[in-house]
Amino acid sequence: MKMWLLFSLLVIISFKTCLSEFTWHRRYGHGVSEEDKGFGPIFEEQPINTIYPEESPEGKVSLNCRARASPFPVYKWRMNNGDIDLTSDRYSMVGGNLVINNPDKQKDAGIYYCLASNNYGMVRSTEATLSFGYLDPFPPEERPEVRVKEGKGMVLLCDPPYHFPDDLSYRWLLNEFPVFITMDKRRFVSQTNGNLYIANVEASDKGNYSCFVSSPSITKSVFSKFIPLIPLPERTTKPYPADIVVQFKDVYALMGQNVTLECFALGNPVPDIRWRKVLEPMPSTAEISTSGAVLKIFNIQLEDEGIYECEAENNRGKDKHQARIYVQAFPEWVEHINDTEVDIGSDLYWPCVATGKPIPTIRWLKNGYSYHRGELRLYDVTFENAGMYQCIAENTHGAIYANAELKILALAPTFEMNPMKKKILAAKGGRVIIECKPKAAPKPTFLWSKGTERLVNSSRILIWEDGSLEINNITRSDGGVYTCFVENNKGKANSTGTLVITDPTRIILAPINADITVGENATMQCAASFDPALDLTFVWSFNGYVIDFNKENIHYQRNFMLDSNGELLIRNAQLKHAGRYTCTAQTIVDNSSASADLVVRGPPGPPGGLRIEDIRATSVALTWSRGSDNHSPISKYTIQTKTILSDDWKDAKTDPPIIEGNMEAARAVDLIPWMEYEFRVVATNTLGIGEPSIPSNKIKTDGAAPNVAPSDVGGGGGSNRELTITWAPLSREYHYFNNFGYIVAFKPFDGEEWKKVTVTNPDTGRYVHKDETMRPSTAFQVKVKAFNNKGDGPYSLTAVIHSAQDAPSEAPTAVGVKVLSSSEISVHWEHVVEKIVESYQIRYWASHDKEAAAHRVQVASQEYSARLENLLPDTQYFVEVRACNSAGCGPPSDMTETFTKKAPPSQPPRIISSVRSGSRYIITWDHVVALSNESTVTGYKVLYRPDGQHDGKLYSTHKHSIEVPIPRDGEYVVEVRAHSDGGDGVVSQVKISGASILSPCLLGFLLPALGILVYLEF
């Protein structure tokens, strides 16, 4: 009895020790001795950097964390490497998400990460920063006014208030919200510091300016006190050279980001801004703003690193600025870890490699805790090595995580999941591999037998390291039963299969080479012998790729007449169909192949290596390399061009005019100066015109002086003491260089000396000359020519125009007003005798409005009355009339006052019956009583019209009823409204027809309500 108790105690102690050891292994990490479907945590959502607006009304912020695991994971959070006390009422958990109530900058700003764990291990999320965003208001102090001479450059400082983060956007208000300044070549708002730059100040810049700052991160905007800008007039503005005042600094950018460089110059005339990458072509993703002041490079790459230059130039001088863009890269995986199962006692090298700039360092976590740095190699693994591993690659720009679970396997050999095939087929003379793949850990030893004979390696037989059996040069005697025996320290197992030998597959009719022209057909023959017990399939491939006959049935067809025939028909062959065709005859056991080449003759392929050299104003030299002639000699080349003005390619004139097929250089001539071009080259042979080359890089031809004169020169009219000159602006293609503008020359018709003025806006077609001594309607000769930095163009034809007339000096007389209704009056007057009257202007305003808010109506000079509509009822109005012409309006007439009538009745007549009587309907309604502020009812208007039409017969009556004829066909509408001195009131209507007396809605409403007995007649 004592021995039995002692034995039981030892068993219990041993069981507890084993159980505790098993539990320790199961806490973090897992050894597998049987099928295991559980797994450790895998993150599906991780926290991200979050900015919480300090003024947010929400009062809480969430950091997300969600992992998939079996069993379900448990979550906890850490901040600045310290555990978060989730028992505090400031924190709560929703699933794995952390919710912070009433966030406090002093307590809650920091770095957070989430831990997810189950009995397979623990993983740590990526780190996320919680910060607090704010944008303070501008100081309340008034900003001093700025005075600048016209023609001089200037800067208005924004001086944004304290803020976080830095991603502000800037705009400037002019005089009031929301009138924002539009940026152009003369005005620029820097998104770096918010300042407003004006290259040269004009009189039109006068106003009050305010810097408007927005923070997209916290959706808040503020604006500064207004800054008065006062341009000081100059008799003549002085030109001065370009001076770059907005300069970009060296930039460190991450690969994939968008980079913005700013460059703006002061100067008079307004400088042109050009960008280039020093010694290298500009990135293909670079874009330059319309004004030229901003260069944006989208999705920047490592090869975009380099020195960038901005050059500003006007006709007084140029300025340059350079800085470097350094492109670095966030860590990116080259090779990372994945969930892995390894046999107990084996070695493991777990590769984890990342690239980036700077080169990332590698560190490891195991179950959420620091474990190792650099390469990870495990030797003679045990269950203690199981768990959740994380490889972290990090550089100065951030970190990336790769998570994986390591399971340790210890299993006796078993073929339950992957037994050997019961029947294995192999062709005589061929090769076969019989797989033996049991599940076992550690790796077992392998033995093979055929029948009762043990197999060993020989010249024909090879047992692979993974246990597979390879037999070469198969004979009929190799058929039989094969068994694979496996054993490790956990147990033994075996599996058996039968090898059956078949006849080999052989090509007996091989395809032969063919030579055709584009559009012709070709046939590739193919036939094979094979084991009659098997099914034969033919597979055709083209240049190594299997032909998909479903997708490519337009050009490829097969002959299915005979099982042993795999003939291929190629229809309407194109150049792309030239190449090597391979026929493969295959069964489930073996295959045999044969190939042939197809030559397709056709138009030439695209020329290559196109280069542009010796760029001049109207010509460029091109060189290229010969492309494929597709088996027919090239007879000539054609150069084609495309400009920014059109998307169409056009044949260019060349020198020589005909480019022979043996040439690889020519010159494109008769080009437009200072125009952006692309070029391509097309080859031709006797079989047609080939594909064009890849277009060249865009180039700009050299500048030249304009050689086209503006057209449609004319003008005249305008305000008093003005000479207005107009012309049709030259389109962009005729500018020929930068700083394009116009020189306008004019003189009195009989004068000797031409007066010349310069107009710098290339898009304008108008100039107004003001001269207080100019006489009205004076004849002038005018002409216009274009200019740029290369020189002047020819003058246009001379046109004769007249200066503006004087405004009329007389006021209209006998102005009278007739009140028509509550919303309309009629105004009439005596005409002005002066011949220079072109129109009359009637100004009118209500007594409660200011005269400055007066409405205006313009009528032709032949009219002596006007109707004013949409007036307010029962309101006093003031009216005056002026005579006008192109120079302006003359003095006003005496002011006349009048009162509009009271408003018409607002209540519609209530129709009480619609009764048929013989051949007519009698419509009856209640009397409308006007309110105290409405005009008295003087009668009623009745409109009798077909339904769906606006016109009909109008009746007037003082009664409360009317008789209308019965419609012969269709429905009619009877509209009734009260009439008064103030106009017509609101309408009531009823529908009638030859078949019914009331609309259904009125019939159902009126008869019960009024107790009217109506006889229906049909």
From Swiss-Prot:
Topology of this chain in the membrane: Lipid-anchor; GPI-anchor
PROSITE patterns: FN3, IG_LIKE
SMART domains named among the record's database cross-references: FN3 (SM00060), IG (SM00409), IGc2 (SM00408)
CDD domains reported for this sequence: FN3, Ig2_Contactin-2-like, Ig6_Contactin, IgI_1_Contactin-1, IgI_3_Contactin-1
GPI-anchor amidated serine lipid attachment residues: 999
Glycosylation positions in this chain: 208, 258, 338, 457, 473, 494, 521, 591
Residues covered by region (Disordered): 698-718, 891-910
Prodomain residues: 1000-1018
Record's function text: Contactins mediate cell surface interactions during nervous system development. Involved in the formation of paranodal axo-glial junctions in myelinated peripheral nerves and in the signaling between axons and myelinating glial cells via its association with CNTNAP1. Participates in oligodendrocytes generation by acting as a ligand of NOTCH1. Its association with NOTCH1 promotes NOTCH1 activation through the released notch intracellular domain (NICD) and subsequent translocation to the nucleus. Interaction with TNR induces a repulsion of neurons and an inhibition of neurite outgrowth.
Name the UniProt record assigns to this protein: Contactin-1
Species of provenance: Bos taurus
